[in-house]
Amino acid sequence: DRLRAAATKAGLKVDGQTRAELALEMFLAAPRVLSEAHSEQKLVRLTSFEHYGGKEPADMAKAFKPLGAEVQAAMAKALDEWFAEHNRGKGTARVGVHAIDGEYYFIIRHGDTFTRVAKVKEQKTEMLHFRPEKDDVGVYSPELNEIRIHAGTKGERDLYRREFGLRLFGDPDYFSKKKAYALDPLLADGSDALNVEGCGDLERAVLREYEVAFDNGFEEVVIRRARDIFGAAEARPVKGDAIPRGGRLVRASFDLYFAGKKKARKVQIRLPNTLKLGRHCDAQAVLWWLS
């Protein structure tokens, strides 16, 4: 569907009946359109993000204006200076934006630190020195007025958080507050905390695993797994708490079931603000469920 939508948007006439036929037609007619569609598909399949909320928890869907080419270029220049200072090369940063399902995916391509790799040919070893390219992603949701960032280091995440705040709203600290997820409702409300009403095609949520840390000086951690944590607790001969009291719930994993999908989608939350989604998971429905 994304390939066909990209072809229609670009004014291409295609009639391929399979994914392969459609991709081949687009490649022959407009390789760049196919490349951009492929990039979008990679973006929506990213699974691990850190989330930051805006200063005002308001719906910005109507007021938000996407960044123009000049602002994207200015952002790339500012990022490039940071990358040069941190051994990632100069003149490598590029910023592109893709509008996908009401959100704006910013892909940041830049150089990484130098790599040395051994190459062997005809029983001779040579060393290759090169700077690999790295892709990072920031996703802004106008409806939730929050940004989520996929990057390898804390320094890069802080950099993007400030730059997105500055370029989108003129304030580098606009996204300074980490959007903290709360797992306490699992303790307080039990299975009722898994209510999915009003979350689009999301039909059911099941708690599969949790991690509880005890601050007793012994670094004690309890991890429990089951096909259904709350269901397993109900089935025990001797009733007790599904999740032990007296500790801090620091991580939880869920199976989410969507309408028309047989296989559950995996979701993991690690406090305070890290969210990992399984492949093909509907990120927007999950974010609404967690809001």
Where are these regions (language model features)?
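Intrinsically disordered, low-complexity, charge-rich terminal extensions
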Residues: D1-S291
